[in-house]
């Protein structure tokens, strides 16, 4: 039936952990999958502020994933710097970020 098809088309998952990451103390990801697309919101805390971090997506996105970052604490400090995001590597499911203060949110959208 149509209802069963829709139930199998959309899924949601909450994932926690920092395996495969560096300079990350905590990470909680919220993943919504719709067919062959996924939206992943990651709430992340860094160990050392403004130092490069390697972040691993809990979702194996294909090439062409959209990534954006919001530094949730950056505007609170006079040392605020421009955030930098590296390219997503589909082979390792990782990307790099820098100039982040304390906690931040990442949004990834792409094909799976």
What are these regions (language model features)?
Residues 1-35, 39, 62-63:
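Glycine-rich, low-complexity segments
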Residues 25, 34-112:
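Extracellular attachment/recognition segments
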């Amino acid at each position: 039936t149509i209802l069963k098809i829709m139930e199998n088309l959309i899924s949601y998952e909450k994932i926690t952990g920092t395996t495969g990451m560096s300079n990350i103390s905590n990470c909680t990801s919220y993943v919504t999958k719709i067919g062959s697309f996924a939206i992943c919101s990651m709430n992340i805390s860094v160990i050392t502020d403004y130092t490069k971090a390697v972040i691993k997506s809990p979702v194996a996105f294909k090439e062409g994933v959209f990534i954006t970052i919001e530094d949730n604490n950056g505007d609170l400090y006079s040392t605020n710097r421009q955030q930098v995001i590296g390219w997503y590597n589909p082979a390792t499911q990782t990307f790099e970020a820098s100039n982040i203060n304390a906690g931040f949110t990442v949004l990834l959208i792409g094909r799976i």
